[in-house]
Structures are given as structure tokens and as C-alpha cells.
UniProtKB/Swiss-Prot annotation:
One of its GO terms (biological process) is division septum assembly. Mg(2+) binds at S52, T74. GTP binds at residues 45-52, 72-76, 97-100, 164-167, 198-200. Belongs to the TRAFAC class TrmE-Era-EngA-EngB-Septin-like GTPase superfamily. EngB GTPase family. HAMAP family: GTPase_EngB. Keywords: Cell cycle, Cell division, GTP-binding, Magnesium, Metal-binding, Nucleotide-binding, Septation. This is Probable GTP-binding protein EngB.
Length: 221
């Protein structure tokens, strides 16, 4: 039995995501959201930033969340649920795969519909504990990301930046991106101060992200 709190969180995170995760609900509109139960954590980001791949990597399941190379494919809020509360201090978790934003080639009416759905969900979901805003480390921060962070700043929702696809950039370039992101976040005081650095392809950062989620769940218990 370890007394290292970080090691304990990592082990708890491993157990949480090693359970039976499955698709639970799809909501094309705010009116069709599932009943609020447990704690929800949402993944937001530009189209093709790697939200579905990250969910698959976190849960260790290659096809839990459907991935696509076609930007804008996810058009609904997709809910996934785990096996239930991990223990007395760690409540039930649901993951939410949100429609990608910033896909300019989609029809304007569809973009407007996605935007409305995303914003209404972010502002009106009492059991939403945190939004992980995914940023493609190859491309960095874009105007569409800034708009979403501004929306989150105006809400009561905690959010944190997750850099994705870090296996595809050199360390020097990644360091530059992280420095630029840190500077950007100075303008967004509601952002969680630490960034998560991940790769769904090689698993980098997954243990740390699972541990961070367990810590958050316990804080909300």
C-alpha cells in the first residue's frame, strides 16, 4: 500500500477507466439531454482535434467513441458512462463528446445549430464539473478556441486545456506552443492553471489525465 498521493490517484484513475465503459446517450438538442446524474466532464475542441480518440485512449477501448477523419462528423452531444461510483469518495462519471467547433466548411445553419447546442449545454448543466478544451499541438490556439474560452469565462464552469497529438511535434515546437498557450491563458482567469499534455496514439499523459479526473470527482463528491 503506497502513501504517495500521486501514485494513489494514478492507480484510482486506472481502476476507474478500466471498468465497463459504454455509449449511453446522444443529444441533438438541448431538449433531449439525459437526466442529470453523477458528474459530467465534457471534451470540447475544434473539429478533428482528437476528442473521440482521447476518449478511446482514456478508456482503453479502440472503438468506444467513433473517430473520423472528416471534420464536423460529431453533430450531437455523445454521452458515455462507466461502471458507476468507483468508491465512496469517487462518484459516478459520465464523459461527454461535444460537437467540434470552428469547421468553416459546414453549412451555416448547421454551424449555428452546433454553436447553440454547445453554448446552452455549457451554461446550463449543473452537474458539469469541468470542460477539457482540446488544442491540437501541431496548430496551437485559434480564434475559435478563444471564443469558447470566453464563453466558459462567463459561466461557472471550470475548464482546463489539453494538448493533443503531441507525438507528432518535436519537443522544441511543443515547448513553444505551451509557452504561447500559457500567455494566452493569462487573459482567461477562469482557466485551470495547469495544462495536460497528451497523445492518444502512444498513450502519453493518459495516466496523469485519469488521475486528474479522479481528483476532480473527489472534490465534487
Amino acid at each position: 500500500m503506497t502513501n504517495d498521493p500521486d501514485a494513489e490517484l494514478i492507480e484510482a484513475g486506472r481502476k476507474l477507466f478500466a471498468g465497463d465503459w459504454q455509449f449511453f446517450w446522444a443529444s441533438p438538442s438541448i431538449e433531449t439531454l439525459p437526466p442529470m446524474q453523477g458528474i459530467e466532464i465534457a471534451l470540447a475542441g475544434r473539429s478533428n482535434v482528437g476528442k473521440s480518440s482521447l476518449i478511446n485512449a482514456l478508456t482503453g477501448r479502440n472503438a468506444l467513441a467513433r473517430t473520423s477523419h472528416t471534420p464536423g462528423r460529431t453533430q450531437e452531444l455523445i454521452f458515455f458512462k462507466g461502471p458507476g461510483p468507483l468508491d465512496a469518495q469517487t462518484p459516478e462519471l459520465r464523459l461527454v463528446d461535444m460537437p467540434g467547433y470552428g469547421y468553416a466548411s459546414a453549412p451555416k445553419t448547421k454551424i449555428a445549430s452546433w454553436t447553440t447546442l454547445i453554448h446552452r449545454y455549457l451554461l446550463g448543466r449543473a452537474n458539469l464539473a469541468r470542460v477539457y478544451v482540446l488544442i491540437d499541438s501541431r496548430h496551437g490556439f485559434k480564434d475559435a478556441d478563444d471564443e469558447v474560452l470566453t464563453t466558459l469565462d462567463k459561466s461557472a464552469v471550470s475548464y482546463q486545456i489539453v494538448l493533443t497529438k503531441t507525438d507528432q511535434v518535436k519537443k522544441s515546437a511543443l515547448d513553444e506552443t505551451m509557452a504561447a498557450m500559457a500567455e494566452k491563458l493569462r487573459k482567461h482567469p477562469a482557466a485551470y492553471p495547469e495544462m495536460l499534455v497528451t497523445s492518444s496514439r502512444d498513450g502519453a499523459g493518459m495516466a496523469e489525465m485519469r488521475a486528474a479526473i479522479v481528483k476532480l470527482l473527489r472534490e465534487r463528491a
